[in-house]
Amino acid sequence: MRAVVLLSGGMDSLVATAEADALGYELAAMHVNYGQRTWHKELMAFRAICDHYGIRHRLEVDADYLSAIGGSSLTDPSIPVEEADLHGATIPTSYVPFRNASFLSMAVAWSEVIGAEKIYIGAVEEDSSGYPDCRKVFYDAFNRVIELGTRPETAIGIETPLIELQKSAIVRRGIALQVPFRLSWSCYKSEGKACGHCDSCARRLRAFSLAGATDPIDYEQRPDYI
């Protein structure tokens, strides 16, 4: 059995990779560089995680068109990365318009070519930033798109093992699976030490605190988000 994992290098995609590995899939890993601020750090994390799990079949894709489209603080330097607002009801500026649909389309195409049966993605709907393309209903609908848009003999399904978990539960699950959190990168802003203040850093730090664990990566600051 073969599975493609969409591996950004962040903690969620790392744990999703570990879930697929634990089920005995032969893993193929895809990473997308889309002009994000921390693209180099994320790419290094992707490669280190692949090395850790012995994933030899890798695909690194350049999707600069997402940067050209803009509209996100991750890809447009004129839009500042916001300070975290963990109780806000609006979608933050870090949302990249329809990004996951682009990623999934590429992953489906690759899966069809290499004969993968599953696509693993570390999307999180609960305790998340509220991105519309991280909802379970989106992935249910995309599975239907795959069914209609691939060859009749193709059977590819999207797996979202973390979709209904709180971030702290993802940390605990990662600890149980002995994942190398030290190799992952989540910060939206910095490629040196993680900033500790962006939405992604805040949610990660809070998750580790609630799980009773220490995040092993370096931060410029470690605010208490509990």
Swiss-Prot record:
Residue sites binding Zn(2+) per the record: C187, C195, C198, C201
Top-rank lineage group of the source organism: Bacteria
Keywords linked to the UniProt accession: ATP-binding, Ligase, Metal-binding, Nucleotide-binding, Queuosine biosynthesis, Zinc
Cofactor(s) this protein requires: Zn(2+)
Pfam families: QueC
InterPro entries in the cross-refs: QueC (IPR018317), Rossmann-like_a/b/a_fold (IPR014729)
Catalytic reaction annotation: 7-carboxy-7-deazaguanine + NH4(+) + ATP = 7-cyano-7-deazaguanine + ADP + phosphate + H2O + H(+)
Enzyme class: ligase
CDD domains: QueC-like (cd01995)
EC number: 6.3.4.20
Keyword hit for Glycoprotein: no
Pathways per UniProt: Purine metabolism; 7-cyano-7-deazaguanine biosynthesis
GO BP terms, alphabetized: queuosine biosynthetic process
UniProt GO molecular function: ATP binding; ligase activity, forming carbon-nitrogen bonds; zinc ion binding
Keyword Protein transport: no
Gene3D superfamilies: HUPs
Binding site for ATP: L7, S8, G9, G10, M11, D12, S13, L14, V15, A16, T17
Residues spanning the signal sequence: none
Cofactor annotation comment: Binds 1 zinc ion per subunit.
Similarity remark: Belongs to the QueC family.
Job of this protein: Catalyzes the ATP-dependent conversion of 7-carboxy-7-deazaguanine (CDG) to 7-cyano-7-deazaguanine (preQ(0)).
Name of protein: 7-cyano-7-deazaguanine synthase
Gene: queC
